[in-house]
Amino acid sequence: MVESIAAGQVSDNKHIEMWKVKKLISKLEHCKGNGTSMVSLIIPPKDDINKYGKLLTGEMSAAQNIKSRITKQSVVTAITSTKEKLKLYKQTPTNGLCLYCGVIYMEDGKTEKKINFDFEPFRPINQFLYFCGGKFQTEPLLSLLADDDKFGFIIVDGNGALYATLQGNSREILQKITVELPKKHRKGGQSSVRFARLREEKRHNYLRKVAELANQNFITNDRPNVTGIVLAGNAAFKNELAETDMLDKRLLPVICAVVDVSYGGENGLNEAITLAAEALTNVKFVAEKKLVSKFFEEIALDTGMIVFGVDDTMKALELGAVETVLLFEELDINRYVLKNPVKGDTKTIYLNSTQQKDSKYFKDRETGMDLDVVSEDSLAEWLCHNYQNYGAQVEFITDKSQEGFQFVKGFGGIGGFLRYKVDIEDHHGDLGAGGDDFDPDTDFI
């Protein structure tokens, strides 16, 4: 088997790319070789690709000293495959290059198979790795799975405000301002009323300034440039900012946490990052819940603007009617293209793991003749590589939330929002592959 995920095939949807990497890591980790028959090579961005060709040549020479004939042959085969893949690249791709080549055992533990993976990661891996052994080294790929959502922080108190972003483990201070607000006036009489009014006016102007700078720092091209915003402070300022209409309406929906901190400035930022950690983790979780809840609402309202089940969803996708595909990240359905060897016509079917073991799906219904398998793909992987051809987007759903669990159990783990209504033959009584029959009385909790 030869698999190549070459530069230029990178999707603009980071969650899809992360899903692909997660599946690839799982596939690589399940590969077992005979002795030292598997090569892992990761080349960092901007490195001279020619020096790695020389590295492999040196490793090839060293392999000639291996006494065991079988081991020597395995190592030479793996290094040769890696060199051949490396020759396909004149220079190191922008984000670096990952190569995994070698000979592995099949599930029976006896049959051997040659596999080659080469791909440019969807973001840089700034780490060199060369390893020749009985398994692939995937640890550097784990960095690609770190969610790089950017979050904004506003730390505000009576001394000033700080604006910052947090992306992964990297934080950036965007702006700092200081303020001198008048203290409360202890004397009575008319002067206290006047001072109180002036103090309140300055406080109001200060908060308005904080809000204006929030707009400047966290809105780009008329939309928020961060996934979520954390408001933090050691006084009532943060609460007033969240509850008044000073903040731009476009920012209000992305406020994910309001936390009390003991300090202002950078110390307050450090504390806010710690206190808001759970809220930041839940942002994607909440977004998923909202998306699936909207899907359920469309069903309840019978708008005709959603589709579910593998057969209906794929039919609507082929018609170009699906705007967003909802896809269970562990979807256990394969896509088969079958060909009648006599008539020459082909058909596409979708089978879950149980159905794949039933030979009836691979026979002609009229004649009982065996059909040729033209192609077999994981449906999820096929969608991730082809969704753009249909003008659609893909959103992954987990079964970790109540809504996600319902989506997987009741709707087969696949569905979609439509651009327009389409007339699809009603198969809702039988979802086919991957799902139980949908019962509106039991599948909504």
Swiss-Prot record:
Disulfide bonds: none annotated. Keywords: Cytoplasm, Protein biosynthesis. Belongs to the eukaryotic release factor 1 family. One of its GO terms (molecular function) is translation release factor activity. Heterodimer of two subunits, one of which binds GTP. The gene is ERF1. Directs the termination of nascent peptide synthesis (translation) in response to the termination codon UGA. In O.trifallax UAA and UAG codes for glutamine. GO terms for cellular component: cytoplasm. It comes from the Eukaryota. InterPro entries: eFR1_2_sf, eRF1_1_Pelota, eRF1_1_sf, eRF1_2, eRF1_3, Peptide_chain-rel_eRF1/aRF1, Ribosomal_eL30-like_sf. This is Eukaryotic peptide chain release factor subunit 1. Its main location: cytoplasm. It is found in: Cytoplasm.
